[in-house]
Amino acid sequence: MSIKYVASSKLPTPWGVFTMHGFEDSDTGKEHVALTLGTLDANTPILGRIHSECLTGDALFSLRCDCGFQLQTAMQNIAEAGQGFILYLRQEGRGIGLLNKIRAYELQDQGANTVEANERLGFPADMRKYDMILPMMEKIGIKQVKLMTNNPRKVKAMKELGIEVVERIPLQVGKNRYNEGYLKTKSTELGHMMSEYHFTGEEKE
């Protein structure tokens, strides 16, 4: 995999002014982004998140998943901490792409869960890869992290790449009547570390 740094710019947000760093994967043509806030010290554990692209949740405010809620909460937590990072990876639909994600949603509308839908389309439950994060982390100068995630695969990926995960911080937000089944499947079939008793915030109607 060949990840090339392209450019950086300021990104004003409701939670503060982040710096946006652009990267290109010359093998796939995909473009990834790292957001950083504050002064980052390689010798200090930095609060952060690996976030896979979710157009429906991040930009279209879908209640079918918890992705948009997690992204916003992560950015808010980083702003409150005064420093941190988000690696925004272009792996829509756990790696199957947007149109296949819509096809999977169609199957879910007919009763399949999120894993069954992917498998009926001929895909694994989760196709995401995380090897691109190492050059991104090296560029922004982070070696130790406090990782906001419920996904043990992300913790494992960072450790295998030589990045020290000092702490895993649960990020359980956004539960509502449209995504209860999805969240249960993520916990029971994808191994995400979640408990319904730990969700925060009001349920959406």
Swiss-Prot record:
GO cellular component terms, semicolon-separated: cytosol
Pathway note: Cofactor biosynthesis; riboflavin biosynthesis; 5-amino-6-(D-ribitylamino)uracil from GTP: step 1/4
Any one GO molecular function term: GTP binding
Substrates-to-products reaction catalysed: GTP + 4 H2O = 2,5-diamino-6-hydroxy-4-(5-phosphoribosylamino)-pyrimidine + formate + 2 phosphate + 3 H(+)
Pfam families: GTP_cyclohydro2
Residues holding Zn(2+): 54, 65, 67
Cofactor, free-text remark: Binds 1 zinc ion per subunit.
SUPFAM superfamilies in the record: RibA-like
NCBIfam families recorded: PRK00393.1, ribA
PANTHER family: 3,4-DIHYDROXY-2-BUTANONE 4-PHOSPHATE SYNTHASE, GTP CYCLOHYDROLASE II-RELATED
Protein name: GTP cyclohydrolase-2
Encoding gene, per UniProt annotation: ribA
